[in-house]
Structures are given as structure tokens and as C-alpha cells.
Amino acid sequence: MSYLVTIIAFIIVFGVLVTVHEYGHMFFAKRAGIMCPEFAIGMGPKIFSFRKNETLYTIRLLPVGGYVRMAGDGLEEPPVEPGMNVKIKLNEENEITHIILDDHHKFQQIEAIEVKKCDFKDDLFIEGITAYDNERHHFKIARKSFFVENGSLVQIAPRDRQFAHKKPWPKFLTLFAGPLFNFILALVLFIGLAYYQGTPTSTVEQVADKYPAQQAGLQKGDKIVQIGKYKISEFDDVDKALDKVKDNKTTVKFERDGKTKSVELTPKKTERKLTKVSSETKYVLGFQPASEHTLFKPIVYGFESFLKGSTLIFTAVVGMLASIFTGGFSFDMLNGPVGIYHNVDSVVKAGIISLIGYTALLSVNLGIMNLIPIPALDGGRILFVIYEAIFRKPVNKKAETTIIAIGAIFMVVIMILVTWNDIRRYFL
């Protein structure tokens, strides 16, 4: 049963993170007028799909990412060229609405035509000889029109609906929006947790066994007001003061039953592993703070949690990248879907609150990792846009596509190696 819960939790976490990321791309793409033929969650074979307006929404088998397919985002060419024989369906204005490429269709009242001239980007027309009268005719293509092949519809994208022909700014927004939406999701989750759990105060809720707070006689309800020479008004002040006094003997003042008392104690030094490449030294008294529920503090606390998490993950990513050049790199520094599944399994056992917190951190991680300047990732593609903005011309399309393809192959190889390493670490 626990495996089933973990699998469901993993699917939900993966689905939410990828959906939010890809929706960010699609939201800004559509605002820029870019046609998005497909919105996919997962990779590989399609297991579910539905069409809404001009976009086909699909769920695919492999939980290793997702994508938004945008018109003009590649070297694809229209499947029709002069000399071909196709069938066309016309609307009441005698405009082409469907260009049928084979016999796998259910359309009626269609015309066969031998294409002599055509333009699917600017002037939108087909000129050719129709079978019914063997005469040459010129047909306009409707703004909303489709290629039909094997029963599937692919909407025709004029030049002004293509990603490649947009200005650098809407391109940048479209590419950056995926990570941006991951950051927004993380911030919302952190703030939501702060509202649900309350924000920590400097009042003692519970003391830990064999820690300085217990040994000094601190009790539930004691409100810490000063550590050494540092005034305390909220829980963050406790951490800041302890970072300064470290493990030196110090005086702690607190309020109990309306009276101010003081004790001397020595904070305990602890080492906490943050990531596979970094750890944190903290000095603690050993108490759990009481929480309070207010209107505005959770917003500030959630934002602070987001900044701390983002700083931690950014530092870890920079450290990982640096280790490639210093010789300290290990695949243990990375987690693929298998590693994330293992982490979700551990987090689920701690409860839904821990799972939400992990999802928030994972969302930050996804956003930051996607901004690494590798050609197949958002960060690499943003570099192409920056080049275009600086030099007032886009990178050669064929060169860009080749570089992105090489980057994609590199990412696939890395994903395979990381997945095998995760399987070896956690299950073998």
C-alpha cells in the first residue's frame, strides 16, 4: 500500500511541476501570438490526448519532462510543395480550410489539385490545376486552416504566428516564463505553508532532551528576549544571534510569568548536510518555537523561506558545475526521476506538509536547473535570444537547431547515466 501512495504522490508532484513549467511557456507564447500545436506532459508514446482550440494537450508515458511545441521552433517545412497532388476543402468564401495529404480522412465535397505554386507563411495561397475542370486556379488559404494526414490535424502557422519570427523580447519572456512559473509556484507553496503552520516566534513550545535549553532550565512558555548582547523580538533573531555567539558561553534572558530571568549556557554546534555537495554549521539551543497565526507575517516568512531555499539550491548548482572543472564531480550530486521517487517515498512518510515543502524546493530546483546555459535547456536558448538582441540578427537557424540537437543528445545521455546511478544507489 505504501508503494501505491508513493507512486501517486510522485505522479502528482511530477505532474504539477511540469504542468506549471510548461504552462508558463505556453501562457507567454500565446500572449505573443505564437501558435502552440501541442502541450505535452511526459515524453514518449501518447497515452491520453484532447484538443482545445489550436492546441493538442497530451499525456505521455515517460515521466521525464514535458514540452510545448511552438510553430516555427525548428527546421520543419510545410509538407506540400509544387508538383504534389493533394485534396483541398473550401469554405463559403472559397478559401482553403483543409489540405488533405492522404486518403485517411472522412471529409466530403473536396477538390483534387496539382500544386503549381504555394505559400504557407506570408501570402497564404495555393495555385494549381484542379481535377474537375483541368484549369489553373488560385485559392487563398484561410487564417485558420489545417494539414490533414493520417486523420490528424496540424494547423498551418503563418509567419506572424511562428516563434522564430518574433522579436527578442517576447522570445525571452516565452523561454524564461517556464522557470519563472516554477519560482512563483514555490513562493505560493511556502506562503501557504506559513499560513497553515503559523510563523515561529521566540517563545519556547518544547525543549529537546540533553540540549542546552533543557540543561539551563528553559520551559514551555518562556519568551527569549536577549542572547548575549543581541535583542530578540522574533525567531529569526535567535538564529542570527546564535550565529554570532557561536559555541561560546553566553547569557540568555527570557520572560516567564511576567518576570525577566537569565541563565548562562553554551549553544551546541551542529552540522547539517544540505545537499550532496554542501553542509551547514549551526548553533542551537535545542527548543521548538511556538507559532502564531497573523495576517501578514506568513507572506514575509514564506518569501524568506523561498529566498533561503533558492540561495541554497543556487549555491549547490554552482558548486556542482564548479566540481566538473575541479575534478570533484559525482553523479551522486544529481537526482533523476528514480532519485526523486526515492525522496518522495521518504518525504511522504513524514506527512503531507513535508511533501508540500519538498515540492516547493523541487520547483525552485527545476527553475534554476532549466536556466543553466546548456543549449537544450531554457537557459541555453535564452543565450541565442540575447545574441539576437545584441547583434540585431538571429543565430543561423540551421546552426541553432544543430547546437540544440547536440545539447538534447547530451541531456539524454546524462539522464540515462543519472537514472542508472539512482537505481544502483537506491535499489541494488
Swiss-Prot record:
Its EC number is 3.4.24.-. Keywords: Cell membrane, Hydrolase, Membrane, Metal-binding, Metalloprotease, Protease, Transmembrane, Transmembrane helix, Zinc. The active site is at E22. Its cofactor is Zn(2+). GO terms for cellular component: plasma membrane. It is an enzyme of class 3 (hydrolase). It is a multi-pass membrane protein. Residues 186-269 form the PDZ domain. GO terms for biological process: proteolysis. SUPFAM superfamilies: PDZ domain-like. Disulfide bonds: none annotated. Pfam families: PDZ_2, Peptidase_M50. One of its GO terms (molecular function) is metalloendopeptidase activity. The chain crosses the membrane at residues 172-194, 309-331, 352-374, 401-420. Belongs to the peptidase M50B family. This is Putative zinc metalloprotease SAV1262. It comes from Staphylococcus aureus (strain Mu50 / ATCC 700699).
